[in-house]
Amino acid sequence: GSSGLIPMGRT
């Protein structure tokens, strides 16, 4: 997952 408002891969 990436850091940010929407951690893609951790949805």
Swiss-Prot record:
The keyword Ligase does not apply. It holds the Pfam family Periviscerokin. InterPro entries: Periviscerokinin. Expressed in abdominal perisympathetic organs and abdominal ganglia. One of its GO terms (biological process) is neuropeptide signaling pathway. It comes from the Eukaryota. The modification Threonine amide is found at residue 11. Keywords: Amidation, Neuropeptide, Secreted. It is found in: Secreted. GO terms for cellular component: extracellular region. Mediates visceral muscle contractile activity (myotropic activity). Belongs to the periviscerokinin family. This is Periviscerokinin-1. It comes from Panchlora viridis (Cockroach).
